[in-house]
C-alpha cells in the first residue's frame, strides 16, 4: 500500500511538472481597470478564452497576470479585454 501511494504521488508530481512546462505567463497592463468590478470583469472575460488556465488582476497596479497554454495568442487576450471597452498592452 505504501508503494502504491508513493507511486501515485510521484505520478501526480510528474504530471504537474509536465503541465507546468506546457504553459506560459504574460502580464498585461489594463489602464481602465480601477475598481473591483473592473478586475472581476477582466478576469471573467479572459478566463472564457479556451486555453487560459488562470488570471489574477491587481487594481492597485492595473496589471493582469495570465497563465495560459502556448496556443493562446496575445490578440485573443486583447480582443477579450476590448469587449469591455478597455485597452491592454503587454508588460513582459
Curated annotation (Swiss-Prot):
A metal cation binds at residues 35, 38. Keywords: Metal-binding. The keyword Metal-binding applies. The keyword Metal-binding applies. InterPro entries: HMA_dom, HMA_dom_sf. This is Uncharacterized protein HI_1050. One of its GO terms (molecular function) is metal ion binding. It comes from Haemophilus influenzae (strain ATCC 51907 / DSM 11121 / KW20 / Rd). It holds the Pfam family HMA. Residues 24-89 form the HMA domain.
